[in-house]
Regions:
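Bacterial Sec-dependent N-terminal signal peptides
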Residues: 1-21
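N-terminal pre-domain segments of enzymes
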Residues: 21-56
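Short glycine/threonine/proline-enriched tight-turn/helix- or strand-capping micro-motif at secondary-structure
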Residues: 41-47, 89-93, 107
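Predominantly extracellular/luminal regions of secreted and cell-surface proteins
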Residues: 61-84
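Aromatic- and Gly/Pro-rich amphipathic surface segment
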Residues: 76-98
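Short beta-strand segments of immunoglobulin-like
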Residues: 217-222
Length: 222
């Protein structure tokens, strides 16, 4: 009983600590719902309307971040960013711009539930703007280009046998200096031209799947 109470107190303390470390970066385009954002429970719903799976783990929340010159590797992280809000946004807690000559780095640790043993583990990103490289335990597990499309990576072979796993994501977004569709996003916003959206901006999650599993569902009419 005492052990259960201690665990509950420690969990509550950690949640309070995380909340205290994060705050919006200014009041830019802030709505009444911004006050409800909690770093310990960010967009908790299953993010994919089709193919919802019973077992999954939400990786939204506070990650470490760094902004470096393009091609450089961070020697240390600058602080924490609230995923899945773009680094330029208020709710990210950062509110910084990333130039085409820079790259945005994310890092966090995660554990895999013991009940997933023997299954493939898929790492899913709802969207990352624009070009993303992903490593698990210093093993590159994939790359994706495109700021509006979800993607999944099989990270099973890169996982540690037990304990923590390290996830690193590097993002490069040239915005209007690149070839990608970008709407009104520009590097120098003014008038009708808007601030860029860089990095992870949709939910990140992982889930176990069988060796043979459904990857996509297409519906067609008669």
């Amino acid at each position: 009983m005492k052990k259960s109470i201690l665990i509950a107190v420690l969990t509550a303390s950690m949640a309070t600590s995380a909340f205290a470390q994060w705050k919006p970066a200014g009041d830019k385009i802030k709505t009444k719902w911004a006050e409800q954002v909690n770093p310990e429970n960010v967009l908790p719903e299953y993010p994919r309307p089709v193919m919802e799976r019973g077992e999954w783990k939400n990786l939204n929340g506070l990650w470490n971040y760094a902004i470096t010159e393009k091609g450089a590797v961070p020697s240390a992280y600058e602080g924490q960013i609230l995923v899945p809000f773009a680094v330029e946004s208020s709710l990210s807690g950062v509110g910084k711009k990333v130039s085409p000559d820079e790259e945005l780095w994310y890092q966090r640790n995660f554990t895999v539930p013991a009940t997933w043993k023997g299954k493939k583990v898929m790492l899913n990103f709802g969207a990352v703007d624009w070009k993303a490289d992903i490593w698990v335990n210093d093993i590159k597990v994939g790359q994706h280009t495109g700021g509006f499309t979800p993607f999944s990576l099989d990270i099973t072979a890169a996982l540690a046998a037990k304990g923590d796993n390290k996830l690193v994501v590097k993002v490069w977004d040239p915005t209007d200096r690149g070839p990608q569709p970008r709407g009104k996003q520009v590097n120098r916003p003014e008038g009708i031209w808007y601030t860029a959206v860089t990095g992870i901006w949709q939910t990140v999650w992982m889930e176990p799947v069988a060796e043979r599993h459904i990857t996509i569902v297409r519906t067609s009419s008669d």
